[in-house]
């Protein structure tokens, strides 16, 4: 083949290659279809898809039916609980064109706060958002952020316990990586100091060191508080089995813990969290400025006493304490 023919073939190949590349690139970078572009998107972020968050989410979805219909989609992300994974999920929500970002729990909410997304963020199931600097104490809103508080003050639970049990030594099991656990720890340490109670702060992180830390509890400790943490949820059964075997009463704000063997629990309703969150989302969808929507407080708060555990631990619960209990586990 002559050189001219070779050059002609080579040039034809290059032209076809460039044309194919341009076609592929035009397809790759073209915008979404009109149907997708017109779709309204709510992006939900929850760490590790925990059972409690799934309950909140189910209530949320059910109550969005009035404003999130056929032209609306709810997209759920369940990243790992580390900061980078959560912040990447926030960025992805923005890139997908979410109109609202919904976060469950403190870790996802703090990740959204750090990212400062240009779209409104609403949260649920967060312990003391003011104390965690998610919303301001004055306006009860954050920067393009609002939601519903996910707790009742831990001081109330501690008072119920100290009114029932003579407490001289008290242990706090906390996760150093949980912002809400650190806040609860500080509050209980201050309350204990005023009452003259000695506190043993037991830090846990990885699943394997729960047993080691629990083994350090004094024989005469009068009670243990399990601080709120997205890590503790998976270890709750183990911790309660250990403490009950050692005849140590446990109090906590982890929802559902009384049914698993905790002595006293002060918890909020997952149903209400989801319902109120949907209420806020509907207001934002209708055009209201999220900065004009202060954080809501929970009204459905349950104080649960496990009398079966009390009997096993030889604890006599005063009638005054039982009279304020929302539910009793027998």
Task: Label each PLM-derived region with a short phrase.
Residues 31, 35-330:
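Short hydrophobic alpha-helices and adjacent helix-cap/hinge residues
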Residues 10-12, 18, 42:
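Small/flexible residues
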Residues 1-14:
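N-terminal secretory signal peptides that target proteins for export/translocation
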Residues 17-28:
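Bacterial N-terminal signal peptides
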């Amino acid at each position: 083949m002559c050189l001219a023919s070779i050059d002609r073939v080579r040039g034809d190949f290059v032209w076809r290659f460039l044309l194919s590349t341009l076609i592929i690139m035009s397809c790759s970078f073209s915008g979404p279809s009109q149907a997708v572009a017109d779709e309204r998107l709510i992006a939900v972020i929850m760490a590790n898809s925990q059972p409690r968050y799934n309950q909140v989410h189910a209530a949320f979805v059910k109550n969005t039916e009035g404003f999130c219909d056929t032209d609306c989609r709810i997209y759920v992300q369940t990243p790992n609980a580390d900061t980078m994974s959560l912040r990447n999920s926030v960025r992805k929500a923005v890139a997908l064109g979410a109109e609202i970002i919904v976060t469950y729990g403190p870790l996802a909410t703090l990740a959204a706060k750090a990212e400062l997304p240009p779209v409104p963020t609403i949260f649920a199931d967060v312990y003391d958002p003011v104390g965690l600097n998610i919303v301001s104490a004055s306006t009860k809103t954050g920067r393009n952020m609002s939601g519903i508080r996910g707790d009742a003050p831990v001081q109330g639970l501690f008072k119920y316990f100290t009114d029932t049990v003579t407490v001289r030594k008290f242990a706090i099991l906390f996760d150093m990586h949980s912002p809400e656990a650190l806040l609860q720890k500080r509050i209980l340490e201050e309350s204990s100091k005023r009452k003259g109670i000695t506190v043993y702060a037991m830090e846990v992180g990885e699943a394997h060191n729960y047993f080691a830390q629990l083994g350090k509890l004094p024989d005469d400790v009068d009670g243990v508080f399990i601080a709120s943490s997205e890590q503790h949820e998976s270890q709750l059964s183990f911790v309660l089995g250990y403490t009950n075997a050692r005849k140590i009463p446990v109090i906590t704000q982890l929802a559902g813990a009384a049914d698993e063997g905790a002595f006293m629990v002060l918890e909020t309703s997952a149903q209400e969290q989801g319902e109120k969150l949907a209420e806020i989302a509907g207001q934002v969808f209708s055009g209201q400025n999220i900065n004009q929507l202060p954080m809501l407080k929970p009204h459905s708060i349950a104080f649960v006493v496990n009398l079966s555990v009390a009997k096993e631990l030889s604890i006599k619960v005063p009638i005054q304490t039982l009279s304020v209990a929302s539910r009793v586990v027998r």
